[in-house]
Amino acid sequence: MKRTLCAGVLLCVCCAASAQNARFTLLGTESVVQLDRVLTTGREHFLPPSERPKGYQWPRYQRAKYPVAVYRVDYRSVIPELHREPVEASGLLAVPLVPGARTLPVLSYQHGTVFGRYQVPSYAFSRSNPSGYPQYSGAFESRLMVAQYAGQGYVVIAADYFGLGDSDQPEAYTLKASEQQACIDLYRVAMAFLNKRGIGESRLFLAGWSQGGLVTTAFLEKLQTLGIRVTASFTAASPNDPFAAMNAWLYHPTPSDPLWENSIVALSLFSYQHYDARPGLVMSVIKPRYYAAFKRIYTRDYPNLVALNGLLVKIAHHPGGLLGYFRKRYQNSTYLADSPFGRLLAASETYQEIFHSPVRMYYGTKDEVIRVAVAKLAERYQIAMGSSSVKTMKVVDADHHGTFLAAAWDSLGWFNSFH
């Protein structure tokens, strides 16, 4: 009876509590039945069977053990690139209701690129959002990680990143320092919140998919600098070096390259222009006729995701693939390397730090976004520096989404082995 009461007290007390300038709003409690539904039927919306590559095997997730209390977290942070200008940020905290628990493992999950402002962790369990159109399905990755990990007894935290969710700034896309700051400040307020209620951290793990893989290794760098121990991390389909990834898309295109690569260019350029205070950067890189459409992509100025897809298709009708959006001087790959845009991309890399804890990097053999050579960059660099901390993990016949599903499943057993 006493053990069960502990979980109940946590729920009741946490609803309106705050810690270190943060507000924690209880969104509800996900039952094990609801969590299991995410792990089974939910994934078929994320990767429909009709789009699944031939030969890909569905992972078989473990059934959830515990119900999970889900909170939206609103907290204060600062923007390193803008001289530590204050910013309102948001994220998610998911606490498994483990009877009598005094310490729990913690997983910080970093989400991938989203095309709706509210397709983020803090809105992953909300059917409505301030945008006026549904974005619930686009936040499946965050629900899966909560179901897979919090359902097995891990506390899960996940930052939205600056400019997404309820944040009051434009999106800070692939801006290393800002993404590190968003993650570390959420970690601090979440741990203070739990500690105040008698729950400590037993071990810290990190994970991220796609853009979130890049953020994960950036966060790992930050934690190492601060002397905060990380037990282990995994990434899935991570562009460890944004410059190398962009170079491959521009100068070595393949038939399988996705249409939405143009949105990556838009998000990156406008983020760099705003946060690195480089007026005119966007116009110096892309042809003027694409400026308005790229700005709409960055600001999410479209009524729904169908309209976004229509916009992407409309501006894709030109020769030259992704490079066709760029000014003529960018036809030379050397120019990109020496340009402000190229240098900003290169500064976003997150694999040249020697990691002090093991990292698994999953890549799919049929990933339409991340080339195998890019996926293996971090491991090869670490080996060259005498480190064996990074290990790449091949997911046979997996595309970009399938790689994430497989990594989320396989990593649980690996993380559990450290307890």
Label every PLM stretch briefly.
Residues 188-256:
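Primarily recognizes the serine-hydrolase "nucleophile elbow" in alpha/beta-hydrolase
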Residues 83-90, 97-152:
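Short, surface-exposed "cap/lid" segments of acyl-processing enzymes
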Residues 19-102:
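Catalytic-loop region of hydrolases
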Residues 239-352:
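Accessory cap/linker subdomain of secreted extracellular hydrolases
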Residues 14-16:
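N-terminal signal peptide c-region/cleavage motif recognized by signal peptidases
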Residues 355, 360-367:
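Short beta-strand/loop motif that positions the catalytic acidic residue
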Residues 337-344, 348, 360, 369, ...:
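C-terminal catalytic histidine-bearing segment of alpha/beta-hydrolase fold enzymes
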Residues 173-195:
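Alpha/beta-hydrolase active-site loop
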